[in-house]
């Protein structure tokens, strides 16, 4: 049985065909370097080389024995020239074509036409009839360069007037034959685009949709569309270098397929031993990607200093967590007591501590430890102070510094805020605002209120365990309205109480009394804003009640009593009036017909 001969056998005559590639001739240069490094006999024994466009230049350099390094150096210079202009190679000022032509004059030897005659086949497209013409006979170096220049000329891209070869005008041969001389049975085809060629990119084997264009079968894929764009409008140099290595690796894969084919043949021999050695070296050097189990290995190898630093950074978080979770005020130390405080609602912007308030639901932030130097530096949770009088005074000064003086002055109708100290009461349960049940202010579950009266301050002092003020001290305002045991109501959410009429400081006149009504932000948030922005009326009516000037009957049961000077201290539990939504409030005075029916 005779030995079977395969295409690509270096001992038999064969041909090599280069397709059109444009700027992607980096790919073909990589394939040529792979053949020179690993299978030099394949290039030495090839008796024919064919090429079109930039592939014709590659074929001419291979025939003349010129290294690809020189061609890539000039190609890099042409790329830099194209990147100078906004239109790239379409710019009239671009001199890329002239640079490539000058390169051929410089690099080709004077007798290059002798080597190329009969061995180099250049594909051209004739302008007159649009037929494909293959040129293989050259009489001079200039004629060879003109044939190569005609094969690379793309109208409008390289110019508007086609060049001439032996009196005829020709343009790029890729318009009629992208892969020249593909009908040769012994031809090894090298293509930049993914197709059915011997050496070409292998994008996706599951796509079998091909389309034929320029007498060439293209594989329909997004990668091929990208390559067509890069061939005319070059990308960055890094991407073009990737094309070079891709061509090198694809040529190695082709040579390995030939080795496998000859191993199955009767000869049982490896015709390209350098390819197998090259592949073993690549595996030994570890150019393959590491397994997934070893990718996170550097992250696991950390020095003991890094681990100790991690523990040192984690300790403050633990300390902050412990200080935040502690609920007993009496156990807090001066160092840990002022680290965090509970954030109050927007309507109650009063905080005795000077530290920034942090919400319990927000993530813990590093807070510097500060030692309190006085009662006004103490935290709002720790309400026990060594000096009760100094503690209350510090709280009042801190509240005045926070800006409550201006807010209270606009809401109390030109009354001084120094005689009406705001008192911060314990926080209320959030469920109380939803149910609306009556809860006394003195209880721990009641909402936080700012009672603008001395009685509210006295009640809060009784709640906090402080000694009450002297009864001989005259109160700054009237007492909180007492509704009696038959109609107890209370606020279900944090709110601000409104002052009743009191005597202006420095004058003997008394201001008209106003009903003390407490409003919850859950019912109507706009009413609370109106309370602080607008000046209160001088009469006993509010904006939420309808005016009725003709009616003289005191239809309302809510009345304010004047405050005597010797008013006793309020009890521990104080009831305040809850004002519902304005749409649910009835008029003070009823019409005569309705009042008669009710009677």
Curated annotation (Swiss-Prot):
The entry's protein name is Omega-hydroxyceramide transacylase
What PROSITE patterns does this protein map onto? PNPLA
Any idea what a deletion of this gene does? Homozygous knockout mice lacking Pnpla1 are obtained at the expected Mendelian ratio but die within 24 hours after birth. They display shiny and taut skin, often with a necrotic tail tip. They are less active, markedly smaller, and weighed significantly less than their wild-type counterpart. Unique linoleate-containing lipids including acylceramides, acylglucosylceramides and (O-acyl)-omega-hydroxy fatty acids are almost absent in the epidermis while there is a reciprocal increase in their putative precursors.
Q: Where is this motif: DGA/G?
A: 172-174
| Organism this protein belongs to | Mus musculus
Record-listed E.C. numbers: 2.3.1.296
Matching entries from Pfam families are given as: Patatin
- What keywords are assigned to this protein? Cytoplasm, Lipid biosynthesis, Lipid metabolism, Transferase
Name the GO terms of the biological process aspect. ceramide biosynthetic process; establishment of skin barrier; keratinocyte differentiation; lipid catabolic process; omega-hydroxyceramide biosynthetic process
Q: Where is the PNPLA domain?
A: 16-185
Q: Where is the composition biased (Polar residues)?
A: 325-335, 350-362, 490-501
Where is it found, in Gene Ontology cellular component terms? cytoplasm; membrane
Does the record bear Transferase in its keywords? yes
SS bond list: none
**Its job:** Omega-hydroxyceramide transacylase involved in the synthesis of omega-O-acylceramides (esterified omega-hydroxyacyl-sphingosine; EOS), which are extremely hydrophobic lipids involved in skin barrier formation. Catalyzes the last step of the synthesis of omega-O-acylceramides by transferring linoleic acid from triglycerides to an omega-hydroxyceramide. Omega-O-acylceramides, are required for the biogenesis of lipid lamellae in the stratum corneum and the formation of the cornified lipid envelope which are essential for the epidermis barrier function.
Q: Which residue windows are transmembrane per the record?
A: none
């Amino acid at each position: 049985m005779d030995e079977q001969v395969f295409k690509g056998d270096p001992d038999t005559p064969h041909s090599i065909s280069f397709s059109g590639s444009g700027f992607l001739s980096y790919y073909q240069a990589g394939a040529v370097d792979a053949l020179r490094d690993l299978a030099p006999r394949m290039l030495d024994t090839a008796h024919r080389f064919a090429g079109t466009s930039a592939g014709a230049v590659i074929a001419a350099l291979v025939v003349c024995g010129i290294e690809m390094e020189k061609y890539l150096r000039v190609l890099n210079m042409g790329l830099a020239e194209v990147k100078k202009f906004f239109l790239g190679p379409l710019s009239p000022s671009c001199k890329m074509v002239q640079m490539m032509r000058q390169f051929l004059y410089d690099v080709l030897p004077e007798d290059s036409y002798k080597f190329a005659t009969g061995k180099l086949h250049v594909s051209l497209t004739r302008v007159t009839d649009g037929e494909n013409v293959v040129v293989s006979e050259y009489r001079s170096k200039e004629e060879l360069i003109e044939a190569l220049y005609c094969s690379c000329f793309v109208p409008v891209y390289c110019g508007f007037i086609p060049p001439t070869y032996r009196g005829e005008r020709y343009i790029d041969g890729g318009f009629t034959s992208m892969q020249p001389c593909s009908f040769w049975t012994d031809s090894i085809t090298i293509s930049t685009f993914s197709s059915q060629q011997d050496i070409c990119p292998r994008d996706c084997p599951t796509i079998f949709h091909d389309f034929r264009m320029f007498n060439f079968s293209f594989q329909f894929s997004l990668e091929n569309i990208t390559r067509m764009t890069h061939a005319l409008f070059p990308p960055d140099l890094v991407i073009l270098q990737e094309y070079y290595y891709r061509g090198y690796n694809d040529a190695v894969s082709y040579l390995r397929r030939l080795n496998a084919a000859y191993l199955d043949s009767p000869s049982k021999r490896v015709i390209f031993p350098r390819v197998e050695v090259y592949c073993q070296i690549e595996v030994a050097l570890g150019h393959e990607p590491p397994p997934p189990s070893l990718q996170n290995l550097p992250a696991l190898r950390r020095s003991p200093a890094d681990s100790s630093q991690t523990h040192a950074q984690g300790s403050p978080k633990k300390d902050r967590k412990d200080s935040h979770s502690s609920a007993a005020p009496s156990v807090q130390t001066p160092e840990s007591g002022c680290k965090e405080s509970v954030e109050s609602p927007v309507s109650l912007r009063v905080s005795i501590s000077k530290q920034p308030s942090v919400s319990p639901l927000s993530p813990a932030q590093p807070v510097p430890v500060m030692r309190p130097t006085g009662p006004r530096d103490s935290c709002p949770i720790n309400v026990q102070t060594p000096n009760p009088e100094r503690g209350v005074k510090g709280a009042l000064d801190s509240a005045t510094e926070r800006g409550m003086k201006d807010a209270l002055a606009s809401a109390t109708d030109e009354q001084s805020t120094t005689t009406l100290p705001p008192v911060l009461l314990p926080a209320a349960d959030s469920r109380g605002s939803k149910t609306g049940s009556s809860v006394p202010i003195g209880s721990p579950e009641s909402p936080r209120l700012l009672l603008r009266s001395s009685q509210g301050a006295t009640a809060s002092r009784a709640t906090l365990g402080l000694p009450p003020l002297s009864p001989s001290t005259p109160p700054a305002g009237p007492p909180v309205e007492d509704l009696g045991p038959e109609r107890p109501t209370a606020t279900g959410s944090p709110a601000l109480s409104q002052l009743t009429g009191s005597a202006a400081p420095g004058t003997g006149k008394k201001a008209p009394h106003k009903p003390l009504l407490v409003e919850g932000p859950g019912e109507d948030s706009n009413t609370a804003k109106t309370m602080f922005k607008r000046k209160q009326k001088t009469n006993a009516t509010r904006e939420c009640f309808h005016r009725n000037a003709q009616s003289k009957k005191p239809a309302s049961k809510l009345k304010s009593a004047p405050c005597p000077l010797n008013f006793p201290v309020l009890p521990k539990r104080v009831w305040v009036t809850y004002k519902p939504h304005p749409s649910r409030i009835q008029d003070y005075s009823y019409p005569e017909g309705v009042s008669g029916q009710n009677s």
